Structure formats: C-alpha cells, structure tokens
Amino acid sequence: MAHEMMGGFFGHPPPPPATAAVGEEEDEVVEETEEGGHGGGVQGKLCARGHWRPAEDAKLKDLVAQYGPQNWNLIAEKLDGRSGKSCRLRWFNQLDPRINRRAFTEEEEERLMAAHRAYGNKWALIARLFPGRTDNAVKNHWHVLMARRHREQSGAFRRRKPSSSSASPAPAPAPPPPPQPVVALHHHHHRYSQQYSGYSGAAESDESASTCTTDLSLSSGSAAAAAAAAAAANIPCCFYQSTPRASSSSTAACRAPRVAAAADTVAFFPGAGYDFAAAPHAMAPAAASTFAPSARSAFSAPAGRGEPPGAVDQRGGAQATTDSHTIPFFDFLGVGAT
C-alpha cells in the first residue's frame, strides 16, 4: 500500500525499454543472445572480430543467395563466429554485386565536393546521391581529393617562390668613384759624407747628423724639366733658408710638422711665372747669400741618384762658393774640426 502511494506521489515509473527489432544489433556486440527452445531459454554466442577470410566470403555469398539479403540472423547461424550485423556490413560494403567499383569521374568528383559543402560529413546521406557508391567509398574518395588538392597547392607555391625571387631585378652595383690626383710625399734621409761631418763611424749612428727633406712629386716629367731648367739658369731647383745649429736640440726640426718646413722653404718650378733667364741679373748678392745652402745647414737640397751631397753645390755655381754667412762650428762630440 505504501509502495503504491509512493508510486502515485512521484508519478508512474518509466516504462521498460522496448526490445530491438528483428535483424538489428548493437555496434559493440561481443556476446549475442538468441532465443531458442520452447522454454524461451537464452543461449550465448561468441563472435569473432578478425578480418574476413576468403572462405568466409564465399560461404556468405552462398547463404545470401539462398536466404536473401535480409535474414542476417539466420545467415549468421551458419557462420561460426560472425554476427548478423557483421554479415550485413560485409555484404553491402564489399560483396554486393551492385556496388560500382569504377573510378570516380570528374563529374562525380564535382558533385561530391558540392554535396559535402551542403551536407558536411553525413556520408550515408551523400551516398544516396551516388547510386552504386557506398558511404565508405564516398568518404574515402573525398579524403583522396583533399590530399590531391593540398599537394597541388603546395607544389604550385614551391614553383612560384623561386620564379618570383629570380624575376626580381638584382640591384645595380654602385659606380666606382672618379679617380683622384695622386700626390706622393717622399721623405729622403741623407747623411753627411766624411768631408762634411769630419768622422765616419759616428756619422751613421748619429741621428742629429741626418737631414730631412720633403719632396713634393707631381710627375717624373715635371721634375726632370725643373731640374734641367735650374741647371741651365745656374740656380738650384729648391732653396732652403739655412738655420744655424746652435745645439743638439736642432734635430727636432726633422721631427717638426711638414707645414713648418714648407713655411721656411722657397721653391721655384718651371711654369710658375718665374723668369729663369733673368734670374742671375735679378738676384742680388745678399739675396743669393741668404738663400744659398751651407754645408752645416739643417736642410739640404736633395742630391741626384748616385751623386754625392756636394754635387748640388757644384751645380749651384758661385752662389755656393761665395757663401759669406759663416756658421760657427761647435764640437759636441770632441772629434775635432776637419
């Protein structure tokens, strides 16, 4: 009584689940139950899940031809280890003679792509649009089409990438800079000979005995022309204002900037507006004595190749011999005057 009251209070209990129709089975059936005998007893049957063997396929074809493609439980009784569902799927997907096994045409492929855009992955519904094609065949061929399209797109991208890079013009190289005139500064270090220094062994190691000259060379032709014109006019090519060497600190003049040396230098070159023909008449003896280099000058005119330092004075003529400006000699090393 109490049970009936509780049932009426909470409502009627849910109805028992309806029994499955004949010929339909669950997907994951491992043990299949069948009704047999007059007492309605239940008998269990173990089903195999392995691949279908050729002997099983041949026997299934014979049973379908004998019982028809609808009595799958009856057919499964004749196949040991196979269920009715397994026999049905094997028949409709692989063994049915109505299956179209030909390759998909271009028209069918276009219809398949359009149907997939419309219905998605509902392969059973799409297979109804292709008579003779199973849902598995339609699904597998759609994946084949997608893989083919992906390969074509990736291949076209790989072919287009090198062509686009090669089509771009390479940057033109920058033009070379215009040539600039080259001005070479030659630093010549001359040593006094024995007749000017008075000693031979110490002259080579004495740094103060060397003289520094800066030769501004524009071209070999202009230098040769200047030397020839100076020799014809009995005037040295370059005159240097002599500076008395009062102490050993005068060697710093060799290390001074070349600007200071150039300020004390008066140079004459051909073509600079100087009349070499009138030079001997125009120059006064005092000017000649002022600019004439002495034997102990801190700066000396560069001698020619293979000539002693006294060759410049010989070419200078009377200007070198009539040097009235006498420089006192200081014997710092104690070797004596010559």
Swiss-Prot record:
Biased composition (Pro residues): 170-181
Repeat in keyword set: yes
Disruption phenotype: Reduced plant size, and reduced levels of sugars in anthers leading to defective anthers and male sterility when grown under short day (12 hours light) conditions. No male sterility phenotype when grown under long day (14 hours light) conditions.
Cellular-component GO terms for this entry: nucleus
Classification via PROSITE patterns: HTH_MYB
Protein keywords: DNA-binding, Nucleus, Repeat, Transcription, Transcription regulation
Residue ranges occupied by any HTH myb-type domain in the UniProt entry: 44-95, 96-150
Region (Disordered), start-end ranges: 1-25, 150-184, 298-322
GO biological process terms on file: regulation of DNA-templated transcription
Ranges of the DNA-binding region feature: 72-94, 123-146
Tissue distribution of the protein: Expressed in root vascular tissue, primordia of lateral roots, leaf collar, and veins of lemma, palea and pistil.
Description of what induces expression: Induced by wounding.
Major subcellular location class: nucleus
Source organism superkingdom: Eukaryota
Biased composition (Basic residues): 150-162
Compartments reported by the entry: Nucleus
Single Gene Ontology MF annotation: RNA polymerase II cis-regulatory region sequence-specific DNA binding
Function statement: Transcription factor required for sugar partitioning from leaves to anthers during male reproductive development. Required for the production of functional pollen grains. Binds to the promoter of the anther-specific sugar transporter MST8 and regulates its expression. Regulates the expression of genes involved in sugar partitioning in flower, such as the sugar transporter SUT3, the invertase INV4, the UDP-glucose pyrophosphorylase UGP2 and the starch synthase WAXY.
PANTHER family: MYB DOMAIN PROTEIN 89-RELATED, MYB PROTEIN-RELATED
Protein name, per record: Transcription factor CSA
Organism: Oryza sativa subsp. japonica
The gene coding this protein: CSA
